[in-house]
Amino acid sequence: MPGAEKILVAMSGGVDSSVAALLLKQQGYDVVGAYMKNWINEDQVIGHCPWQQDIEDARRVATQIGIEFRVVNLMREYRERVVAYLLDGYARGLTPNPDIMCNREVKFGVFRSWAKDHGFAAIATGHYAQRVEVKPDLVTPAVLGGLNADGTPASTFALLEGADKNKDQSYFLALLSQEQLRDARFPIGHLPKPELRRIAREAGLATADKKDSQGICFIGEVKMQDFLRAYVPDAPGPIVRATDGRELGQHRGLHFYTLGQRKGIGIPSNTDHEAYVVVGKRAADRALLVAFDHPDAPGLFQREVRVHALSWIGKPVTTARALEGRVRYRDPRVPLEFVPESETTALIRFAAPQRGLAAGQILAFYDGERLLGGGVYA
């Protein structure tokens, strides 16, 4: 019975997680809401971080739908597992993805562990993604699912894109494990956003018309460059045109730029109004390499790329095969050939050249709508 399952809902103070909690309550589950207090911007150096308002909004919604509400303090774990990863990556010239790491390490990591330690069967979030049960093959036992108490193979779970393709957030879950997915619930994954807003308004939820957050995971409405300026020292160097080696100016630090970036480089376009784009970084002299934004700009487009730190939600892909990939959030899935080189690395051959594949970012692998896993651009 649904009522036998106790679920802890990660309530961010936004409308998505509010409706997630509401739907689970309506379905008869034993629901408790919790706000993860991961960052409070105590030094006020990075601008607006509305955590206090978010807690109040989440608390108001919990009261409205009649569920218990808690605040779970995970600030130390967030700094150690997400902020440190973020700052270390940028300091090494990479372009990390804090949202994906936050999901793996915090939301479905330490928060999930906290929930299990406090008697919850599962956690739920407001992600636009869908979790489906995959029945085991009774001839070949499902190793990933393990065994039931009676010795029969246990089910495994697959992660599908959200039904609303404009809001799909499966990409951000690319590094989850089967164990993490087993304990996850995504109550709104089948809903289009307008329908979700309608449900929130009809229920009179305090967050029904609250705008969606666009900031860094759990930090708030903060631009990445502002965050980096607060915590990573400037390391100036030359801006160099890759095609002829001409120095065009100076930059404040390579960590402020990523491959494919056009805005904020700090050098004007030419007389034909052609914009410059970042095509690389040269660590030896801290040079930022740029070129005019053309299809033939050196280093801007890649047909082949290597990925490492492979992570699979289900059975690992161990032989060369055709898959689809999402090279960054909101980009469409594109066809590729996956060629494994080891358990943790692979060569990727795209059917068409891809733009701006920055080292440190995540490539998510799909089989149709099913998310298989992901890897990090080398």
Swiss-Prot record:
Keyword Disulfide bond: yes
Residues binding ATP, per UniProt: 10-17, 36, 126
Main location per the UniProt record: cytoplasm
Domain of life: Bacteria
Site (Interaction with tRNA): 127, 361
Alphabetical GO biological process terms: tRNA wobble position uridine thiolation
GO cellular component annotations of the record: cytoplasm
Subcellular location: Cytoplasm
Keyword NAD assigned: no
SUPFAM superfamilies: Adenine nucleotide alpha hydrolases-like
Molecular function (Gene Ontology), one example: tRNA binding
Catalytic-site annotation from UniProt: 102 (nucleophile), 217 (cysteine persulfide intermediate)
Chain positions covered by the region annotation Interaction with target base in tRNA: 97-99
Keywords tagged on the record: ATP-binding, Cytoplasm, Disulfide bond, Nucleotide-binding, RNA-binding, Transferase, tRNA processing, tRNA-binding
UniProt family annotation: Belongs to the MnmA/TRMU family.
Protein name: tRNA-specific 2-thiouridylase MnmA
Phylogenetic placement of the source organism: Bacteria, Pseudomonadati, Verrucomicrobiota, Opitutia, Opitutales
GN (gene name): mnmA
